[in-house]
Amino acid sequence: KSGYVGDIIPRGEHHYGQWMNNHYLYAVKKAADYKICVNGHEAVRPTGLCRTYPNLIGNESARGTEYEAFGGSKPFHTTLLPFNRLIGGPMDYTPGIFDTKLDFMGDLPHGQVQTTLAKQLALYVTLYSPLQMAADLVENYEKHMDAFQFIKDVAVDWDDSEYIEAEPGDYITVARKAKGTDNWFVGGITDENARTAGFTLDFLTPGKQYVATLYADGKDADYKENPTSYQIKKGIVTNKTKISVWEARSGGFALSLIEATPAEKKSVKKWK
C-alpha cells in the first residue's frame, strides 16, 4: 500500500500537481520492475493506467468511507462512484463498517457513517476492487458474525458483471460472477430514499440450482436511527427465480448465489 496522507509530500509539492503526478507514475513503474503490487491512496484519479500496469491493483483517489463520517459525504455518494471514479480503474473504498456510529471518538463534525450495515456488505460488489478491506474493528465483526460471513464468501475478481438496474445518484444493483467458478454475488444500494429492488436471476446458468443467501435491511432499518438492523434469508434458486428486496434509507442488500451441493438440494428449502 502506497500513500501520501496529509503533509507527507516530497519537497513540499502540491498534492495533485504535475510533479506529484509524475511521481505516482514513477512509483507504479518501479514497483512493476520488482513485481510488487500497488494500492495507492491519496493519489490522483486513475485513467485506465492499470491496463498498462496491472500491478496497480487499486487506488483510493476519491472520497472513501472515512469521509462519510469525517467529511460529510452524502448517502448518494456511493451510487455515483461506479459512473465517474470507477471508470478510471478499481477503487479501494475500504467498506465493511458494521458499527457506523462513532460517538466513542468524541465530538466529530458528522460522527456517523451514512449507511446501514447491509449497504456496507453491498459495497463489496458495487464498488469493484481486486483488493478489498474489512475496515472495521474486530470486536464489531464479532457482534455480527452471521453478516460477516458475506465478507468471507464474496469474491474479489470476476469473470462477468451484469448491471441490473441503476440511476446515477439514486440507486444501483450489480451482479458479478466469481472468477473461475459458477458462483455469483449481487449488491444493491440506494441513496437517502428507501426503495424496492426487483430482478430475475436470469444471468444464472440454466438448469442449475444455487443456494441463495440474502443479507438485507431489517424492517425497521434506517441509516440514521437503526443502521445495524438486518435480516438473512436462504433458499434454493434457479435462473427463473424472481427477487424482490426492500432497501431502507441509505440501505442496500448483498446476495450470494453458490452452486448447490447434492445434499443442499435436499436440505435447503426452495426460495419463496
Describe each model-derived feature in a short phrase:
Residues 1-111:
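Aromatic- and carboxylate-enriched substrate-binding clefts and catalytic-loop regions
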Residues 35-42, 69-70, 132-144, 160-162, ...:
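Acidic/polar loop patches that form or flank catalytic/metal-binding clefts of enzymes
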Residues 38, 126, 186, 250:
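Conserved, mostly hydrophobic/aromatic
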Residues 47, 98-136:
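Charge-patterned, long linear interaction tracts outside catalytic cores
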Residues 136-185, 220-226:
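Glycan-recognition and catalytic regions of carbohydrate-active enzymes
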Residues 168-210, 253-256:
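Carbohydrate-binding surface patches
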Residues 214-240:
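Solvent-exposed beta-strand/loop surfaces of large extracellular or lumenal domains
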Residues 234-271:
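C-terminal beta-strand-rich structural cap/linker in extracellular carbohydrate-active enzymes
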